[in-house]
């Protein structure tokens, strides 16, 4: 019998995003959060994800000052932040909170123009560690934050992402509030423009 031709190669299964675990930032996970920040140069030069909080960054901002302020918020329970884990390693986060908890958004003057209703919740800073980008970390964080908001009673949620279509690719620091298309995946809609490339996007969660 003549040799049969070998069967065609089986196509490789499509790549899927890793299965992440999410946990809230609190006293029990502070060291995991701090390790991620330290591994990424304090995050954008030492922000420590304090920029949206009432204290903000300011002229006297330093990594030491910002770390201390963030730790105080964690101890006092005045922070809402989802940490994303790959195994036992914290690889990113998604910050959220009320306008009172996160009052310092970007472009505040433009934001107040045409404001008709304050949101119940804001999504602030989104961060992914440098070795884990483009693997769905931000998506997992936003999903977990929205689940937490739903569990807390829902309401009107705002995000302040950057438009990515129609412009040159941007480095991560410019996308610290997330890209617009990420929030479109979760049903957010444009409300109004507050900067050349930044939009207020909204979604109501029942």
Regions found by a protein language model. Name each.
Residues 72, 76, 85, 89-129, ...:
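Conserved acyl-donor/pantetheine-binding loop and adjacent beta-alpha core of acyl/acetyltransferases
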Residues 174-206:
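C-terminal "cap" of GNAT-fold acetyltransferases
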